[in-house]
């Protein structure tokens, strides 16, 4: 790969040079896929044409370069980009980060990083990932990436304050696209930003990112046309010009903006509202810890500590009462695995390829099992023939049962077609889990042999019941999935009992404490309760949750009669699971008891203590202890 990255120490020489005309190409939304040759053909044509154009100084590729972030396609992409005689720079898009068997680690291994920063004449280009992270959510810029952005631009400003800056993301930095857009624009507004470059919408668009021009370029795909294309951006001493370049045709300019000193003294876009917290003053944030690093999964509760892992691969134990760090353990890569705690031991997977078991008391490593691939699966601990066992799947297409005490493998199942990220369900002598292959698996707990495999029949693996945590009761297994179907399956045979699209569900589900009711959440406001015993779909109640559009896979956890869940934009809910008394008041099932906005980013599946207390982690890097005062 041919790249030029200028060190900040050289910036005074570079940026004080006289600005001259230069042009560069922007490739976006290439969507290479092993299932289609069209995207590769479109890319080859663009690479051939760009390589032959000696006026192009460099190339920027702004995300969705592959369909699913798989290593094979990333390496194929790199091979094509390496044919360019000029340097190129890449960042990732939502198709690299949402559906990634490698937990986004393959991108960094192939390209070095999803970040880049370099100078060209008196301009500075800085690219970074804009999410989402390994599940359905809005785009999100990780807190550690925001800190890197600020640090890099601060260093640049000290040595070359007049440099013209071009941030590069995939998503536009605006409400509805990136949940914490304002955290990013509050940083960018302090500098001489000319325009933010991006893609995502597959067409030429000009947006305002809190007053900063945010320009999106076309997709490289040909779509309904015979050939694809790309964007050419020309910089001159007084203007920036965007042209669409269709393969074999003359470039057509579609936008021009002035080039020169820029200032954005005030925010112009409306910030998220936290007014809902005034409606429910009884909800208290007893403590909150902000780590500055994204947290991608649910925490787990021990005797005196709360446990979770973060995007930097650090595993934490926090004091439950104070939020102070009790101990930390460093793994080799990001953690996207909700831990399990039992008998003084805490178990989790890491994307460094290992399954870890640590002492609950002091974080000492008791054992680890290497898998040879990323582990995003969430473990459960269950008994197999009198032995406590850890049950967990990974990206090596293997599901394992491991002795909790020793780390000895009890059995393994190697027939999983997709990768596993879910927390499995143990029921009727089986361990049940979904994978990113449209399948739901039931393995015999005693020996790991397959009892059955259920499929939704789709050819699109993005409809898989992979993220949902299955629930089971009354001889049935219940799932919801991105196909927006509520499904009931016979636990003994894997036979479909019913599937219904009556409610537009997605990936959030839960089971009542008495096993009679299944809870789920729709993509628009509605919370539902379904009868777990009925031979056909039967809605017991439904209620308006007033959360708007939401596809966050936060499971519907009931504790002491209260369902607690969080949304993609930081809104925590408490809902009555049944007719009950709460805070001394008689309420009906489905009543929204309280709501509380913690931030504007994804809340992971909640860790409840009681109907009045829970712990919440978020992709914004926060851990919050919530108490509802009686």
PLM feature spans:
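Short loop/turn segments that connect beta-strands within beta-propeller blades
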Residues: 319-323, 359-362, 403-407, 444-448, ...
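His/acidic metal-ligating clusters that form di-metal
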Residues: 49-59, 137-213
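Extracytoplasmic beta-rich repeat domains
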Residues: 280-300, 327-342, 367-385, 395, ...
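Acidic/histidine-rich helix-loop elements
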Residues: 25-44, 66-68, 96-110, 132-144, ...
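N-terminal active-site segment of His-dependent metallophosphoesterases
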Residues: 13-76
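Binuclear metal-dependent phosphoesterase catalytic core
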Residues: 212-276
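Blade-level signature of beta-propeller repeat domains, shared across WD40, Kelch, NHL, RCC1
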Residues: 598-630
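Metal-dependent catalytic neighborhoods of phosphoester/phosphodiester hydrolases
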Residues: 37, 62-82, 97-109, 176-184, ...
């Amino acid at each position: 790969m041919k790249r030029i990255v200028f060190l900040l120490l050289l910036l005074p020489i570079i940026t004080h040079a006289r600005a001259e005309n230069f042009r560069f190409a922007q490739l976006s939304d290439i969507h290479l896929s092993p299932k289609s040759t069209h995207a590769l053909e479109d890319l080859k044509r663009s690479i051939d044409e760009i390589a032959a154009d000696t006026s192009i100084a460099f190339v920027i590729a702004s995300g969705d370069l592959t369909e699913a972030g798989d290593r094979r396609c990333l390496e194929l992409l790199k091979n094509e980009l390496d044919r360019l005689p000029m340097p190129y720079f890449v960042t990732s898009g939502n198709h690299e980060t949402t559906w990634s068997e490698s937990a986004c680690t393959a991108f960094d291994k192939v390209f070095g990083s999803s970040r880049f920063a370099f100078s060209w004449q008196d301009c500075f280009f800085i690219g970074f990932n804009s999410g989402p992270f390994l599940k359905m959510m809005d785009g999100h810029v990780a807190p550690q990436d925001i800190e890197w952005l600020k640090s890099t631009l601060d260093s640049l400003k000290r040595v070359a304050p007049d440099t013209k800056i071009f941030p590069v993301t995939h998503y536009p930095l605006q409400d509805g696209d990136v949940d914490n857009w304002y955290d990013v624009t509050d940083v960018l507004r302090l500098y001489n930003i000319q325009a933010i470059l991006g893609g995502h919408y597959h067409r030429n668009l000009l947006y305002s990112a809190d007053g900063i021009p945010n320009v999106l370029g076309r997709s490289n795909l040909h779509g309904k046309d015979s050939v694809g294309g790309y964007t050419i951006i020309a910089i001159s001493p007084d203007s920036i010009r965007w042209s669409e370049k269709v393969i074999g045709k003359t470039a057509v300019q579609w936008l021009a903006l002035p080039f020169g000193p820029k200032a954005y003294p005030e925010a112009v876009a409306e910030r998220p509202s936290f007014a809902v917290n005034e409606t429910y003053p009884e909800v208290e944030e007893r403590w909150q810890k902000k780590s500055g690093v994204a947290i991608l999964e649910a925490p787990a509760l021990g005797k005196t500590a709360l446990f979770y892992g973060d995007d930097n691969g650090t595993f934490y134990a926090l004091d439950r009462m104070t939020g102070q760090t009790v101990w930390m353990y460093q793994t080799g890569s990001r953690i996207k695995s909700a831990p399990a705690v039992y008998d003084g031991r805490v178990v989790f997977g890491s994307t460094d390829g290992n399954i870890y078991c640590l002492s609950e008391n002091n974080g000492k490593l008791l054992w680890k099992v290497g898998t040879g691939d990323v582990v995003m699966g969430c473990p459960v601990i269950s008994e197999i023939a009198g032995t406590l066992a850890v049950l967990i799947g990974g990206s090596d297409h293997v599901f394992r049962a491991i002795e909790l005490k020793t780390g000895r493998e009890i059995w393994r199942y190697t027939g999983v077609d997709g990768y596993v990220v879910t927390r499995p369900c143990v029921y009727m002598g089986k361990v049940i889990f979904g994978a990113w292959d449209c399948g739901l698996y039931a393995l015999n707990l005693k020996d790991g042999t397959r009892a059955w495999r259920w499929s939704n029949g789709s050819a699109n693996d993005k409809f898989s019941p992979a993220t949902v945590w299955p629930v089971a009761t009354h001889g049935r297994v219940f799932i919801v999935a991105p196909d927006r179907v509520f499904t009931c399956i016979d636990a003994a045979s894997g036979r479909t009992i019913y599937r219904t699209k009556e409610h537009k569900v997605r990936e959030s589900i839960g089971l009542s404490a008495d096993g009679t009711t299944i809870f789920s959440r729709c993509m628009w406001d509605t919370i539902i309760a379904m009868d777990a015993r009925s031979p056909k779909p039967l809605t017991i109640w439904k209620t308006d949750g007033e959360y708007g559009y939401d596809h966050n896979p936060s499971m519907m956890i009931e504790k002491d009669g209260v369902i607690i869940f969080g949304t993609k934009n930081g809104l925590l809910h408490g809902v009555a699971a049944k007719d009950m008394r709460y805070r001394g008041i008689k309420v009906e099932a489905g009543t929204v008891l309280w709501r509380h906005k913690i931030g504007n980013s994804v809340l992971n599946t909640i860790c409840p203590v009681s109907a009045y207390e829970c712990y919440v982690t978020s992709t914004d890097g926060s851990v919050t202890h919530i108490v509802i005062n009686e």
